[in-house]
């Protein structure tokens, strides 16, 4: 949608970053959010895998870990809406809580593996 608002033309394929300057403000925020989502995924995915491995070896993890695993993706959806909608306080709260969820998964997964 942001490309259509930036009057996308085929010649823009030669220099896609130059077209970015013509994006509307919400389009730029959507692009930044997209990049940030990759960064968040690289932190959360290993935590989720660690928790899964711990659960397979030691049995079910505490409810807190399960809640954190489900809460993080939900928070990312709210984060995306807040980022594109330019609502920084909600965006910051979602980011911090999502980071906490990943931390909980790392903590509970390591605790289960080391104690089990």
Regions from the language model: what does each represent?
Residues 44, 48, 100, 104-107:
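Alpha-helical transmembrane segments
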Residues 77-100:
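Interfacial loop-to-transmembrane junctions
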């Amino acid at each position: 949608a942001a490309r259509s608002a930036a009057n996308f033309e085929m010649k823009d394929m030669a220099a896609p970053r130059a077209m970015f300057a013509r994006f509307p403000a919400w389009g730029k925020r959507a692009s930044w959010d997209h990049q940030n989502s990759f960064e968040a995924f690289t932190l959360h995915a290993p935590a989720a895998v660690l928790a899964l491995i711990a659960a397979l070896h030691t049995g079910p993890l505490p409810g807190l870990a399960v809640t954190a695993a489900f809460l993080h993706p939900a928070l990312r959806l709210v984060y995306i809406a807040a980022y594109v909608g330019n609502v920084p306080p909600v965006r910051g709260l979602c980011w911090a809580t999502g980071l906490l969820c990943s931390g909980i998964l790392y903590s509970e997964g390591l605790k289960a593996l080391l104690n089990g």
